[in-house]
């Protein structure tokens, strides 16, 4: 009896070892079951075993991974082989689709950091591009992303640690019979076979329609050392994502093995079928032809022709009235693009009564959208198309930057020779109205210090919180808006600049306002330090209640920075405060703000604080550093003697747009 029991235990152990070894080596699925995979996002397994990564939902992600990791020994030659069948089905017949899917090898199944759209549910805008990401993705991308150097429209690519492909090709397969490549439509909804083979040094990607055997020649072949990328344990699976354009993405079957010898074949006859695209063109029923009297036909024609002419004239007039400029590359920005018709109606036809300000190259109008939302619409003239694509992309990106002390930029509209920028309307206008115009009540010191803290917080977010960092480049009182509760909101993204982590800049405009420009600006270009300089001028502007340059004043008072510095030397710093403050202020706080303004306007950029430090000083969580009016760089710069509202241009590759989107409400 004991001998029989030992035999049973022995064979049971052998079977378990064999099963474990088979799972470690590979698997094959001719259809899927819920217990086989780890699934998240909108991915799901449909009845019949069809794995659906995405549906027609916008901006969504779906993942499906084999639950157990596979062991890879980076110290020795590693290999793997996979074969799967997928289908990317448009939501309806002939529709454009987005955004694509990828086969993924990753050290983790946690992709909570990943973005949809062009990031395919695997990467995000700040994905580390070093080898520490340990990610391999073979993408079937259906949308061209210019920033990623994508090929046109649908393409296949190899991604290592970031979404920019190291190798890519248009989808096709090699026909031995014809001796040439035959194109494949990835987004037709028809099943496509994909083979990915890695033999230790060469990564091959091969495609073919469902009815074609594996071609002898791969679509992509790339020498790569994956032992530098893979860790000891790696997960394998699929990721799919949608943008504003969507598609239903399916996996019908999947085979994987670390060894070519043990690779199991898919049984294509057993695979579930993917749904076909909907054809919403209903058939027109045939009706029996009826004979009409010739006189009746003639009468109908005489009546119909004038009506058609009138309708045609009305249609032509309305089309010309609401005509816009639209190009194919703008489709992805759809939610950020407003129709001219909607803006025309919101502003009652851009009537004079809706005009709330002028500045730069355009006028600002107040409008109300159908839902009751109040907007500000700035109409800018533009003739050249050069740089327009980059400018619109940056406007849309800046529209995604959210902070309680930034004026929300909602979107844009393009017409021939005209660009319209749409932002949220600020009911209390711009701060300069209250500082420099006697018809408006002057803000108290408590209101002023609160506004200064608001704008410091906004600028600190642009410099340190936004990704990539943004340089504002035109901080001044006329670009600070006040909402319904008199909170400070920083506007004027018309001149903002992005700064990438390497310090490279891409400009939406290349101008600045005299009196607010740091002395090094023309020599070295814009930087966070030049923004801090302008903020220092803004501190003095708000505290003293005057502009940085007043040509009608005596010489000793003409330049704000120099005047404040001289008064500090004469122990009369508080005399520079705005007389309209009266006695309702804290002397120590006013002196601190004035000194901080001088510190921010130091001639030496490296001696200026960053905006994080400025916030600490304003909230008095940290004392000002020890310096005096005689310290090097304090109060020494003399700006050019021109009108303070003048702007100058600095050479730049991008189109030029000046002044605030919201500048000058109520003037």
UniProtKB/Swiss-Prot annotation:
The active site is at residue 474. Glycans are attached at residues 55, 110, 124, 128, 181, 204, 225. This is Putative L-type lectin-domain containing receptor kinase I.4. It is found in: Cell membrane. It is a single-pass type I membrane protein. Residues 316-667 are cytoplasmic. The chain crosses the membrane at residues 295-315. Residues 24-257 are annotated as: Legume-lectin like. InterPro entries: ConA-like_dom_sf, Kinase-like_dom_sf, L-type_Lectin-RKs, Legume_lectin_dom, Prot_kinase_dom, Protein_kinase_ATP_BS, Ser/Thr_kinase_AS. Residues 1-21 form the signal peptide. It comes from Arabidopsis thaliana. Keywords: ATP-binding, Cell membrane, Glycoprotein, Kinase, Lectin, Membrane, Nucleotide-binding, Receptor, Serine/threonine-protein kinase, Signal, Transferase, Transmembrane, Transmembrane helix. It catalyses: L-seryl-[protein] + ATP = O-phospho-L-seryl-[protein] + ADP + H(+); L-threonyl-[protein] + ATP = O-phospho-L-threonyl-[protein] + ADP + H(+). Residues 350-625 form the Protein kinase domain. ATP binds at residues 356-364, 378. The keyword Secreted does not apply. It comes from the Eukaryota. One of its GO terms (molecular function) is carbohydrate binding. GO terms for cellular component: mitochondrion; plasma membrane. The keyword DNA repair does not apply. In the C-terminal section; belongs to the protein kinase superfamily. Ser/Thr protein kinase family. Residues 22-294 are extracellular. Its EC number is 2.7.11.1.
């Amino acid at each position: 009896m004991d001998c029989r029991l030992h035999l049973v235990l022995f064979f049971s152990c052998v079977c378990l070892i064999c099963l474990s070894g088979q799972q470690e080596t590979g698997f094959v699925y001719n259809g899927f079951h819920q217990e086989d995979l780890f699934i998240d996002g909108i991915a799901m397994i449909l009845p019949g075993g069809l794995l659906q990564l995405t549906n027609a939902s916008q901006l969504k992600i779906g993942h499906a991974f084999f639950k157990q990791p596979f062991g890879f020994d980076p110290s020795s030659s590693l290999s793997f082989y996979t074969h799967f069948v997928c289908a990317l089905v448009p939501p309806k017949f002939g529709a454009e689709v987005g955004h694509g899917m990828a086969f993924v090898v990753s050290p983790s199944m946690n992709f909570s950091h990943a973005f949809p759209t062009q990031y395919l549910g695997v990467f995000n805008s700040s994905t580390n591009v070093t080898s520490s990401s340990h990610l391999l993705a073979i993408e079937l991308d259906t949308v061209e992303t210019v920033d990623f150097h994508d090929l046109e429209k649908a393409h296949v690519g190899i991604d290592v640690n970031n979404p920019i492909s190291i190798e890519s090709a248009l989808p096709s397969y090699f026909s031995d019979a014809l001796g040439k490549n035959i194109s494949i439509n990835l987004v037709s909804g028809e099943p496509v076979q994909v083979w990915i083979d890695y033999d230790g040094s060469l990564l091959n990607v091969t495609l073919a329609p469902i009815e074609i055997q594996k071609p002898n020649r791969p679509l992509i072949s790339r020498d790569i050392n994956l032992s530098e990328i893979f860790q000891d344990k790696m997960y394998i699976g699929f990721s799919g994502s949608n943008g504003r354009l969507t598609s239903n993405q399916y996996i019908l079957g999947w085979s994987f093995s670390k060894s070519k010898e043990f690779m199991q074949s898919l049984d294509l006859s057993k695979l579930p079928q993917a749904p076909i695209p909907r054809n919403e063109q209903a058939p027109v029923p045939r009706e029996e032809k009826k004979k009409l009297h010739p006189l009746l036909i003639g009468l109908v024609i005489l009546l119909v022709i004038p009506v058609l002419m009138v309708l045609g004239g009305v249609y032509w007039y309305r089309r010309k009235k609401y005509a816009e400029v639209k190009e194919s590359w703008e489709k992805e920005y759809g939610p950020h693009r407003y129709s001219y018709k909607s803006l025309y109606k919101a502003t009652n036809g851009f009537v004079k009564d809706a005009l709330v300000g002028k500045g730069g190259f355009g006028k600002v109008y107040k409008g109300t959208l159908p839902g009751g939302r109040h907007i500000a619409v700035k109409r800018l003239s533009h003739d050249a198309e050069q740089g327009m694509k980059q400018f619109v992309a940056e406007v849309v990106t800046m529209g995604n930057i959210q902070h309680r002390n930034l004026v929300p930029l909602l979107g844009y509209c393009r017409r021939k020779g005209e660009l319209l920028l749409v932002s949220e309307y600020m009911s209390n206008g711009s701060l300069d109205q209250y500082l420099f115009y006697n018809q408006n009540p002057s803000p108290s010191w408590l209101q002023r210090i609160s506004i200064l803290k608001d704008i410091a917080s906004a600028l600190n977010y642009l410099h340190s919180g936004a990704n990539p960092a943004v340089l504002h480049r035109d901080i001044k009182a006329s670009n600070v808006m006040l909402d319904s509760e008199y909170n400070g909101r920083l506007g004027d993204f018309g001149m903002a600049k992005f700064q990438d982590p390497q310090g490279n800049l891409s400009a939406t405009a290349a101008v600045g306002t005299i009196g607010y420009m740091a002395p090094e600006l023309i020599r070295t270009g814009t930087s966070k330090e030049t923004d801090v300089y302008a903020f220092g001028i803004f501190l003095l502007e708000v505290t003293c209640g005057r502009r940085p340059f007043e040509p009608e004043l005596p010489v000793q008072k003409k330049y704000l920075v120099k005047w404040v510095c001289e008064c500090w030397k004469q122990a009369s710093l508080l005399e520079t405060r705005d007389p309209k403050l009266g006695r309702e202020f804290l002397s120590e706080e006013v002196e601190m703000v004035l000194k901080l303004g001088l510190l921010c306007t130091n001639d030496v950029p490296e001696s200026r604080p960053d905006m994080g430090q400025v916030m600490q000083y304003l909230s008095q969580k940290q004392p000002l550093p020890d310096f005096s009016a005689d310290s090097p760089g304090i109060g020494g710069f003399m700006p050019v003697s021109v009108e303070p509202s003048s702007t100058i241009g600095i050479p730049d590759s991008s189109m030029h747009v000046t002044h605030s989107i919201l500048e000058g409400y109520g003037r």
